[in-house]
Amino acid sequence: MIKNAYINILEISSVSLSTGSASTSYPLYRLYDRDIGRLFKAGSSATLEILINQGTAGTVVDRMLIPSGHNLSGMALSLQNSTNGSTFATVYSCTQADTALINATFATDIKQYWRLVITSPATAPQIPELFLTRDYTWESDPHLYGVGSLDNIFNVENDVAAGGQDRFLVFGNPKKQRNYKVVGADSTQETNILTFNNAWAGSKPFWLFDHSSEWIYGKLVSPLNLKIDDMNIYSFDFKFLEVLP
C-alpha cells in the first residue's frame, strides 16, 4: 500500500539539547526546516541528547526518518519517550551501519516528550533532518497501468553549436517522479487526502512510500484535482517529484 509521512512533531514542539551543544554555523533548527541540504551539526563529539517537548501528549508517532547525508555510521542511537520528561523508555535503538536513510518503526505511541540520544560519538554528529512522524496508509492504491510516469527526470542542458553539434551539460542527480491516479476512493480517503494536502500546503516536502516499497522525499508538482465521480466516490491525481539535497 502507498503511504505518506507528512507531519514532523519537531515543527510543533520545543526542541532543545538536554546534553551536548550545537555548532553556531549549523544550528539546531535545521533538524526541522524541511531542507535536507542544510545540516545540523553538534558542537563536539560528546554525547548528544535532542529533546522534543510537545507541551501536551500531542501527536501520534510511529516512525523516525533521517535522510541520507548524515554521518551517523558506527554511532549508537537511541530514540526514547516519556510522559513526564524525567523517566524515559527506549522505543528504538541501534548502532547505525551506514550513511543511508535511517527508517525506524516502532509501536504507535503518544507521548509529550521524545529524545534522540547519540552516545559517545567518535566525531561530531551531523543530521540533515530529523522526522518523528506517523504513516498515513492510503485506503486504496492507485491504478499503475497506463496512467503514471515512473521514469527519472534528468537535469541536462542541451545546446546546439553553429555546426549542428549537440553539447550536453549535466547538472546534479536525476529526480524520481511518481505520477499516480486514484479512482474509486471512498469518503474516508477523500477526507484524509485533503488533510494531507492542507498539511503539506504546497511548501512542505514530505515522504512517499511508493509502489515499489521505496521511501522518497519530495513534493507535489500539481494540484490533486479531487473529483466527485459518484455519491461518496472520488478520484484524484498524485503527481510527485523528488526533492534533492
Go through the PLM ranges and name each one.
Residues M1-L48, N53, T59-G74, V91, ...:
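Extracellular/virion structural assembly segments
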Residues L77-L79:
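Short beta-strand elements bearing conserved aromatic residues within extracellular beta-rich modules
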Residues T87-A89:
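Tryptophan-centered short beta-strand motifs
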